[in-house]
Structures are given as C-alpha cells and as structure tokens.
UniProtKB/Swiss-Prot annotation:
It comes from the Bacteria. This is tRNA 5-methylaminomethyl-2-thiouridine biosynthesis bifunctional protein MnmC. The keyword Cytoplasm applies. GO terms for molecular function: oxidoreductase activity, acting on the CH-NH group of donors; tRNA (5-methylaminomethyl-2-thiouridylate)(34)-methyltransferase activity. Its cofactor is FAD.
Length: 621
C-alpha cells in the first residue's frame, strides 16, 4: 500500500494520482451535511444505532461531520469506510488547520491512525462511535466486508477521474452490504452512477444539488439477491435487543475476561464461571509474556489474521490497562534460519515500516523490530480485568440445555445451575474435552516457562528459537516448551534445560540461576487458527451439506444453522494475548449484528465448522 500522493493548490487538498480535489475549501462540511449526513435525518427516530458505510474515506470529512451529529447523542454510530491511499498524518493535520474546523477530531484520529496494512482497522473513536477503516482497492476490500448498512455515502473521486470505484462490481457489493430500504447518497449524477445503482437493485431519484451543483443522486434499495455464496459460513442470527439480557462466559483467562468486558460494555449483565478457585490458572497465568504477531510472508491468511488480531489487541490494552501491566517497547523477532530470513525480508517492499522493519545487520541474527509489540503480565492483567465482574469460582461446566423460554440452562459439576440468554465458552485446553463430539481438531499442548534471577538487561522481548522477556519484579521469564497432548503438572528439569538452550544466543546460560518454573496448557487447532464464532449445529451440517463434494460451487445451499446463542472463543495457542481480543470483538459483532472486525476470508478460517466443511467438500463424511 502507499499513501495518497497529495499536494495543495493554495489551501485545497489535491490528489495527484486522480487529478482531482478532495473537496472545495468553501465550507466543505456544509456540502457534506447537505449531500450525505442529511440522509440520517430520514431514519433518525427509528433506530438507536446506525451503520453508515462509505466509498472513499479521503480526509475523513464525512466521518467528522457525523461525529459532530453524534457527539451529544446516546445513539451509536458504526462508520465503515474504504480507502485505497490513506492521507499521511501530517497532511491530515494541515488540511484541518487550513479549514479551521474539526481540529480535535483529526488529532484524535491521527493518534489512532492505522499502519499501511491492507484490511480492516477498527478504531473505537468515542464511547458511542466506532470507525472501521478498510484499506485496499474497492473491488478487493468490499467482498471482504460483512454488514448491512443503513446508509451508503458514495464519495469517491469523480467517475471521470476514478471509474474503478464506480464499477458494476462495486455497486453489486454495495447492494450485498445493504438491506431492503438502505439509502445511498452521492453528489454525482453521472450515467455510470445512475446505471450502476439501478442495476444493483436501487430505486434512484434526483434531488436538488448543493450550491452550484444542479442535482445529486439519492437511492433506496428495493430488491436484493438473496442467494448465498459459502452458505455454511453465513452469520448466525443476532440476539436482538440487549435490554435486560444476560451472558454467561465460561473461563477467566484473557479470552474469557476480554469477551465478558466487550459484552458488558454493550449492555449485557455478565456472569463468569471458573472451574478453579482463582482467575488465570492455565495458559493466561504466566508472570510475563510477549504481545507480538506471528509474521508470515505477505498475503498469507494466517499472518493476515495475526496482524489484525495484534493491532486490535494493541488498541484494547492501551485503552483498558494501566501502564504498569504492559509496556509497549517493541520486540525483536530474530530470523534464526534461512527460511525466516526470506520470510521477514519479503516485507521490505510492503510499506509496512509503521508496523515492523527488517534489519539484516542485527545480532545474533537478522530480524524484524515489531514497533508496537509489548511485554505484559498476563496473570495480573486477568486479575485487573476481572475486578468488576461477578465470578462463580469452583464452577466447572458439565452440560447445557435450551429451555422453552429461549434461555439456556447451564449445569455445573458442583450440582449448581444457571440460566442465561447467551453462553460463551472461553475454555482453553479444556475445550477438547467439552467439544469432543464436534469435528473441531482441538488439542491440548503442555507448555513450561522458566523463571530466572534477572540475567539480561533487555528492555524489550527478544524472540528466536525461544524468547526472553525483560525482568519484572525480580523475575525474568524464558520459554516455552511445546508438548502436544501431554499431561504433567509438575515442572521438568529437562524442559528448563531446553528453555535455556533456546535462548543461549542472548547470554551465558551457565550463569543463569533458575528460581522457578510454571506449567500451563494451551489449546491449539489443527490448522493453527483460533476457533471463534457461533457454535454450529453439527447434525444440520452433516445432513444439509453432505453433497458439498458436488455442490460446493453453487449458490443455492441452505443457510447455516447454529445452536442458538452459543459461542466459542478458544484455541489461541501461544499468542492468545493478541487473538483473544480479536475473539472478544468478533463474538460481540455476531451477537449484535455489527460489521465484522475481520475480513470474511479470515472469518471463514476462524469458523468453528471449518474442519467439518473441509471434510464434507472432500466427500469424507
């Protein structure tokens, strides 16, 4: 990706690539209000939350104009905007300095501005305003989005300058991301716009234009193609009104507590159940750990997912944790073999310097500096996040049953039970036992970390064959071992020796003093992606998709069926500090019918039914 090639014609921002202005400097916010945000007035009284989508974020003028409208309102705005070439921070600041308006908004945006990485970047802009900045070409990023907009702002550069954003395929995607009754507004009355809207199912009307523009286009979606591609990955039914509803989250690791926090923030009365007598007794219970993404070659889905999760986690922890629990000093991930050197160096021409930078002269190996990586105290984070919740300790899950009143009755092994409206399993390594009858390929992996008396004065995590965190409270953590399907709660001397061997490039391990060890169990999936989403109806899938070997490319397969209001967020492996936050946000998106916080292709990779679907497509079930 590249930033916008922007210049100034006097005080007017001008895009050199498209040979067009972003807007006129004669109070352009008034045109934004007239053409675009006035559409909100037509439906303002009918809803409490709105999804507004836009083709062409540009300088963010329409977004800021909407922010002003929602500033003193209890209503919620979720704004989704695509952008091929984001404007540089310094140019954004200059634009609004020249305009003399929205200065506080632009400073806030600049402080949260995403790196130049294609995909969806979620920004919690205000308590009632969410911004999804979607970087990429319109025809490539729109198919990756999933929501039903209330209003569309069609605000790309003029059709004569940038025809690709007004193409037939783009209009089809706009219709897919709408519902019957969705409003579309644009300043343009060009033929390509009118034909594109009509062919996509919109009823077009021409309205009086702003100032010197004679007319503008307004349209309402009349009909929609309901054929589903990839029907087996269709979204579940949302919960509907949250008013008075309860949520039960099982598990008090990072995944469980982050999920509980997101649901509570959105109006649910949340209760958390924990099998043990305290929080974070398993994989989230380490004294110190690193927040860093798995870096693959560019474009690999596993790496794309980890970068998205990492960026969501960085924003979450910065907004919700005290600085004493996490330090964003960056991290160095060393390429200790030729394959890793190839992988990391392939990012050099990807304009990703805001995220990480490859340095072949680092010692003891070439490596990448991951700018916003951090070292954190997972156990203390869990204690902090749990402080505002009702937690039922010594409540180990046993079974569930759906009641006629729509609620779910959950029974625990201590003979107690609880009714809830929604149920979320954040059960880590216990998930393989709970969901043993599901085709999910979950396994438990034993991991041991070693606690050293401080031996290296590193200010950031160093990662090669193993990792070493900075010393915290007189303890330096190194790790970690991996032993799939092994159960042994007692630390092993040979595992401590392995951990020391794996960090021997960084210090003389013969001088290391071991002062302790910790064993935890992580959950892993068979394809290394977490398992996040609505829990599918296994029998429905086997019955209705048994012919996928022949029909997988058709659009007439029945829509997926799910166990009502049951969700899962587990199999986070060794990078749960990042992916658990993605899971919390994604489940909340599904529950509330919000836009998805991750691209559809990655949503499919996380889907709990993906292993079953792969077998059905191969005719193996």
């Amino acid at each position: 990706m590249k930033n916008a090639n922007l210049s100034f014609k006097g005080q007017i921002p001008f895009n050199e690539e498209f040979d067009d202005i972003y807007f006129n400097t004669e109070k352009p916010w008034l045109e934004s209000e007239f053409v675009f945000t006035s559409a909100l007035d037509e439906i303002w009284q009918s809803k409490d939350s709105f999804i507004v989508a836009e083709t062409g974020f540009g300088a963010g003028l329409n977004f800021f104009t909407l922010c002003k409208k929602f500033k003193n309102s209890s209503k919620k705005l979720h704004f989704v905007s695509i952008e091929k070439s984001p404007i540089k921070k310094e140019d954004l600041l200059k634009i609004y300095e020249n305009l003399g308006i929205f200065k506080a908004y632009v400073k806030k945006l600049v402080s949260l501005y995403p790196p130049l990485i294609s995909g969806i970047h979620r920004i919690n802009f205000a308590p009632n305003i969410t911004l999804d900045l979607c970087y990429g070409e319109a025809d490539q990023i729109l198919p990756e989005l999933d929501f039903a907009a209330d209003i569309w702002f069609l605000d790309g550069f003029a059709p004569s300058k940038n025809g690709s954003i007004w193409s037939e395929d783009v209009f089809k995607q706009i219709a897919r991301l709408s519902r019957v009754g969705t409003i579309a507004r644009t300043y343009s009355c060009a033929k390509i716009v009118k034909v594109g809207l009509k062919n996509a199912g919109f009823l077009l009307s021409l309205k009086e234009g702003y100032a010197r523009k004679r007319q503008m286009s307004s349209a309402v979606l009349e009909k929609k193609d309901e054929n589903l591609k990839d029907a087996w990955f269709a979204r579940c039914e949302p919960v509907g009104s949250v008013n008075g509803k309860t949520a039960l989250v099982i598990g008090t690791g990072v995944a469980g507590l982050a999920t509980a926090g997101e649901l509570a923030k959105n109006g649910f009365k949340v209760v958390i159940a924990e099998a043990k007598s305290e929080v974070a007794t398993n994989g989230s219970g380490n004294h110190c750990g690193a927040l860093m993404p798995l870096v693959t070659k560019p474009g690999v889905n596993l790496g794309r997912m980890h970068i998205n999760a990492f960026l969501q986690a960085v924003r979450f922890y910065k907004a919700n944790l005290p600085k004493s629990l996490i330090k964003f000093n960056g991290c160095i991930d060393y390429a200790f073999d030729d394959e890793l050197v190839k992988r990391y160096s392939s990012w050099q021409d990807q304009s990703a310097e805001d995220l990480f930078k490859f340095n072949e002269s680092l010692k003891p190996y070439p490596g990448i500096f991951i700018k916003e990586a951090a070292y954190a105290r997972p156990r203390e984070i869990c204690k902090f996040l749990s402080s505002n919740f009702e937690i039922l300790f010594n409540h180990e899950y046993e079974s569930r049953a759906h009641l006629q009143n729509g609620k779910i009755s959950v029974k625990f092994k201590n003979k107690k039970s609880l009714e809830t409206d929604i149920l979320v399993f954040c059960t880590g390594s216990k998930s393989s036992e709970i969901f043993k009858d599901y085709d999910m390929q979950i396994s438990s992996v034993r991991g041991q970390v070693t606690h050293l008396k401080p031996v290296l004065k590193n200010e950031l995590p160093l990662s090669a064959k193993g990792y070493i965190c900075p010393a915290v409270k007189g303890v330096q953590v190194i790790g970690a071992t991996y032993a799939r399907n092994e159960i042994c709660d007692t630390p092993k001397d040979e595992d401590n020796a392995k951990n020391l061997s794996d960090v021997s490039e960084f210090f003389d391990t013969t001088k290391a003093a071991i002062i302790g060890s910790r064993v935890g169990y992580r959950s892993y999936s068979g394809d290394r992606f977490p398992i996040i989403g609505a829990l599918h109806d296994e029998e429905f899938y086997k019955q209705n998709y048994k012919g996928l070997f022949w029909s997988k490319n058709k659009d007439n397969n029945p829509k997926a069926s799910y166990e009502k209001n049951v969700f899962v967020n587990f199999a986070h492996g060794s990078r749960g500090l990042g992916t658990a936050i993605l899971g919390a946000n994604l489940i909340t998106d599904l529950v509330l019918a919000r836009p998805l916080c991750i691209e559809r292709s990655l949503f499919f990779e996380l889907h709990p039914a993906r292993f079953l679907i792969r077998k059905l497509k191969k005719g193996l079930k």
